[in-house]
């Protein structure tokens, strides 16, 4: 059996390496930095810890991405503190708007942006729920064999039938080609500012340039099992090393 070399000890590289190792393959991970985790790493300087990039992590819910990672890596539990308050956004006028994971988020949106903003949030949540449902079915993409192609088609049909009228709707298909801004044209200006601030962090662009499906997903972090790691985001990589 040949050795497998994984380039980079970011989260993707570490998950790949530990999964292959548990499957019986000899694996070597090559990393240029002195710490693992990549942009989800924690570095040390003069006795202090600094997160390299992200300070929050999501996906820690039953059946979620990090739950699947834990199963693949043989990790019984992630040592992070769950939180319903993912972040507080400070607006230019001084108002602080919380982003809750639970039903409080709806009240926060109405208080900050009025009822006029709710169609946008309903679109965002409905859209991203459909996308996560598809992604967590783990379709093989792109398919490499005829068998895999059949499996992808079967997965797609099962996903479509789970919410037929929404998932074959012209709106969802059109969002493949539209921008987030197309869903904000009737929304309050402050809402666009609020959305753009978060997209700049999670999608590295604003609603005028972010694809609608990608942007809806990028805005969904508070609802996806957020955890805070007391010793830094690099704790995730440490569990995988």
Predicted feature descriptions by range:
Residues 125-239:
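Active-site/ligand-binding neighborhood in enzyme catalytic cores
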